[in-house]
């Protein structure tokens, strides 16, 4: 009996030791899953998804998103940076972009590379191939490509842009390499959430070879506008959240045009959670559009993100000044029992600062700008309006009616 009891005690010791080792193994595996999993944006097979009502029960992680205005690489910026990096031009903004889960920008110019000729004047643009890597260096993970400059270098420019972005691992949509690709939904997965991103423009400055190469809606009553809405409905059925990037509106005005007034509510009705507008080269209002008990965040225009021009000849004094001011929109996509909600929304006004004949480029938050810097800005030589106080006043007048938090203090 004594021998049997000893053996049983040994069995218990071995069982206990085995249990401890198993628990340690499971703990190590859990830690590895947290620290070595890729929670950044991952493209998924286009067109994948479930039915219209997606189950959010198992999804608890929110996704923080930052949207920017137009990246417009005009001649002074190209002369400063050449085919190299953007240096420390975005140093004041970088921490904000690095801290989010997903940054979406409007890439206003083709990234066709040196072989197609680098230009930033006469409203015909083309950027160096290195630009795609610059986007990645500054934590921009996704770009909208449907805009009026998409075809500035024709079909080859469209193809080169897509190739350069692919090589830099930057997600993109709005221009396409085939009809089949055009008919698919672009979905990125971030923190386990499937986010569909749709991109359309009112038109392009230059013609392109095939209708499927660029998403262009032309007018709010066109057949292509119905294709746009069908894209949004399809995206709604294939993703947890839907973001629609629209290149629309009238340049150099705070007011909305007919295309915005008509299509905005229709896009919301079709299933967009967020609408990101660009093209007017100035900020425009933001609002919540309510349809069928749903609320869609609509940012009519975020203005310029990165640009370099003073005394823009097509604008009056107000919008020559406001050409230098844009906004970042930050928001969280939060899963819930009835679908994704948009929360923690805020608008961060920014200033493109440069001095003299396009020197000392610096992108800054307006809240950190000073009257001394405003006095040194190149635009101040032509406009006494260009003061920090006046810029802040304009931003308040545009965004305050939305009730969205404005980061100015």
Regions found by a protein language model. Give the residues of each.
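Acidic, metal/ion-coordinating pockets
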Residues: 2, 10-409
């Amino acid at each position: 009996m004594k021998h049997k009891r000893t053996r049983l005690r040994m069995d218990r010791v071995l069982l206990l030791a085995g249990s401890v080792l198993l628990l340690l193994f499971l703990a190590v595996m859990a830690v590895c899953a947290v620290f070595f999993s890729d929670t950044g944006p991952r493209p998924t097979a286009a067109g994948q998804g479930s039915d219209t009502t997606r189950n959010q029960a198992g999804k608890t992680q929110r996704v923080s998103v930052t949207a920017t205005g137009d990246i417009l690489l005009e001649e002074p910026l190209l002369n400063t940076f050449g085919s190299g990096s953007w240096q420390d031009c975005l140093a004041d903004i970088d921490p904000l972009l690095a801290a989010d889960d997903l940054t979406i920008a409007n890439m206003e110019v083709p990234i066709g590379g040196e072989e197609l000729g680098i230009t930033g004047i006469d409203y015909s643009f083309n950027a160096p191939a290195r630009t795609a890597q610059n986007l990645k260096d500054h934590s921009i993970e996704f770009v909208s490509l449907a805009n009026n400059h998409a075809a500035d270098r024709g079909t080859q420019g469209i193809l080169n842009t897509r190739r350069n972005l692919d090589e830099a691992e930057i997600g993109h949509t709005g221009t396409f390499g085939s009809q089949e690709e055009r008919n698919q939904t672009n979905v990125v997965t971030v923190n386990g959430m499937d986010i569909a991103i749709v991109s359309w423009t009112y038109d392009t400055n230059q013609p392109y070879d095939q209708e499927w190469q660029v998403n262009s809606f032309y007018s709010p009553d066109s057949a292509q506008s119905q294709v746009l809405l069908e894209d949004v409905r399809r995206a709604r059925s294939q993703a947890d959240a839907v973001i629609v990037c629209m290149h629309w509106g009238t340049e150099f005005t705070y007011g909305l045009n007919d295309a915005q007034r008509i299509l905005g509510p229709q896009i919301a009705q079709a299933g967009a959670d967020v609408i990101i507008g660009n093209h007017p080269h100035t900020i425009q209002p933001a609002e919540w559009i309510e349809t069928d008990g749903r609320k869609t965040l609509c940012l009519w225009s975020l203005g310029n993100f990165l640009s370099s021009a003073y005394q823009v000849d097509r604008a009056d004094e107000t919008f020559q000044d406001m050409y230098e001011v844009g906004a970042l929109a930050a928001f969280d996509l939060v899963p819930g029992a009835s679908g994704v909600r948009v929360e923690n929304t805020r608008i961060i006004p920014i200033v493109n600062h440069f001095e003299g004949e396009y020197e000392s480029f610096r992108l800054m938050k307006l809240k950190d700008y000073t009257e001394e810097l405003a006095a040194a800005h190149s635009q101040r030589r032509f406009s006494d309006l260009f003061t920090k106080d006046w810029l802040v006043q304009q931003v308040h007048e545009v965004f305050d009616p939305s009730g969205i938090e404005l980061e100015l203090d």
